[in-house]
Design a protein with these regions (language model features):
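NAD(P)+-binding Rossmann beta1-loop-alpha1 motif at the extreme N-terminus of oxidoreductases
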Residues: 1-57, 127-128
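A general structural signal for well-ordered alpha-helical segments in protein cores
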Residues: 16, 20, 63, 75, ...
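Glycine- and other small-residue-rich loops at beta-strand/loop junctions that grip anionic moieties
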Residues: 68, 93, 135, 157, ...
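Solvent-exposed alpha-helices and their adjacent loops that cap or buttress functional pockets
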Residues: 3-6, 31, 59, 85-87, ...
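Rossmann-like NAD(P)(H) cofactor-binding subdomain of soluble oxidoreductases
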Residues: 23-24, 45-47, 56-132
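A generic structural signal for alpha->beta connector loops
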Residues: 34-36, 52, 89, 111-114, ...
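Internal alpha-helical scaffold of NAD(P)-dependent oxidoreductase catalytic cores
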Residues: 85, 103-113, 129-167, 180-189
Length: 189
């Protein structure tokens, strides 16, 4: 993946728990310079604290991408601080469960290109499937960038309509849990 635009302009992670850390680890090992990454996280992990990134520091003026990875219940408090980047130059990529594109547009404004992505649990070990859906401002280059970044945690699937996200979540999100349960039952038999 070509990280040149991100390396020059920066990537902001709003929240960096298990999924965000798994992605960042993949990006750094694939050549993204650590100094191109800004993380806003009130409770950073020990791993995150030893990375050579900008942790809870002043943000770049025009980042290439803001990855929103906060828990849904924290979204209303966390996202407004990113609204200054809603001018159309910065791509917003959300992996926050259950938060619609319309919810992001209400906070970020009508000019922000937004992609909603829903990774499943196996993504934490790089074997996931992530469904993607974007707003009307999304161009092919945005999808290519999102797919390249999300490739760090597995495969991606483009959806035609955001409404399909619920169906995908039911199958890809719950499916692995059922398989793991079935394996446990077979092992116990």
């Amino acid at each position: 993946m070509d990280f040149s635009d991100i390396a020059q302009r920066g990537l902001v992670l709003l929240g960096c728990g298990k999924m965000g850390s798994a992605m960042m680890e993949g990006w750094l090992s694939s050549g993204l310079p650590a100094q191109s990454v800004w993380v806003i996280d009130p409770h950073p992990s020990a791993w995150l604290q030893v990375q050579d990134i900008h942790l809870n520091a002043a943000l770049p003026s025009d980042p290439a991408l803001v990855l929103v990875a906060v828990k849904p219940q924290l979204m209303q408090a966390a996202l407004p601080q990113m609204s200054r980047f809603g001018n159309g130059n910065t791509l917003f990529l959300s992996i926050a469960a259950g938060i619609t594109i319309a919810s992001f547009e209400a906070i970020l404004g009508p000019h922000a290109p937004i992609i909603r992505a829903m990774p499943n649990t196996p993504a934490a070990i790089g074997q996931g499937i992530t469904a993607l859906s974007g707003n009307r401002l999304i161009e092919e280059r945005h999808l290519v960038l999102a797919e390249g970044l999300l490739g760090a945690i597995g495969q991606t699937l483009r959806l035609e309509h955001e409404a399909q996200m619920d169906a995908v979540t039911g199958v890809s999100g719950s499916g692995p849990a059922y398989v793991f349960y079935m394996i446990d039952c077979l092992a116990a038999a």
